């Protein structure tokens, strides 16, 4: 079904593209929010990525790669937003949780710890981590999406994972994994 919508959109069918956007906008926004940590910037990046996708859709060679292509556009927009220097205060940047809106207090505490850990990462490390763990991208797919070699993608995911683990251990004052040192 998605391939049919993509092919129709590539042929100029605005309704087909609108349906693709409707189907994917929540996930795109969630990814942008995780990367940028700001609701307004995430919304701007999502809208701009969808605009660029519509404008440049005819450049897409393989309709089966639409989702990966769209995520690549979104990541570029997130980087652009992050570099633009627009910043929100911490209070303005707080966004109601996406995944755990009605979760019990323990899940909210975990979400807060994860958000604090993500905040400590650079946008490059945070993006690699989100693509790998949230979207399930393989290392070559991350490299393709970010325009970096697979080895660089691997090192970013590894480093981000190490830093997140260390942050979670420090924040929760949990015992360290085997060997007594962060991994």
Which residue ranges define each predicted feature?
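N-terminal module of bacterial RNA polymerase sigma factors
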Residues: 1-27, 34, 116-119, 166, ...
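Internal acidic/polar
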Residues: 2, 80, 88-118, 138, ...
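Short, charged helix-capping/linker segments at alpha-helix termini
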Residues: 8-19, 29-48, 150, 173
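Sigma70-family region 2
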Residues: 10-11, 37, 48-65, 84-86
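C-terminal flanking helix
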Residues: 25, 29, 50, 122, ...
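Arg/Lys-rich amphipathic alpha helix in sigma70-family domain 2
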Residues: 55-62, 72-93, 107, 159, ...
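Helix-turn-helix DNA-binding module
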Residues: 116-127, 131, 135-152, 163-166
């Amino acid at each position: 079904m998605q391939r049919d919508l993509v092919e129709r959109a590539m042929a100029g069918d605005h309704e087909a593209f609108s349906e693709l956007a409707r189907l994917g906008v929540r996930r795109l926004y969630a990814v942008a929010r995780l990367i940028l940590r700001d609701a307004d910037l995430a919304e701007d990046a999502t809208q701009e990525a969808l605009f660029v996708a519509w404008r440049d859709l005819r450049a897409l060679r393989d309709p089966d790669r639409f989702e990966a292509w769209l995520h690549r556009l979104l990541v570029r927009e997130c980087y652009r937003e992050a570099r633009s220097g627009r910043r929100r205060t911490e209070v303005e940047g707080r966004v109601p949780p996406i995944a755990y809106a009605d979760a019990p207090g323990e899940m909210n505490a975990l979400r807060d710890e994860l958000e604090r850990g993500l905040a400590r990462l650079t946008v490059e490390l945070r993006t690699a981590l989100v693509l790998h763990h949230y979207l399930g991208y393989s290392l070559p797919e991350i490299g393709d999406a970010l325009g970096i070699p697979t080895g660089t993608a691997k090192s970013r995911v590894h480093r981000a994972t190490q830093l997140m683990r260390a942050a979670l251990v420090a924040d929760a004052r949990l015992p360290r994994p085997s060997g007594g040192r962060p991994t």
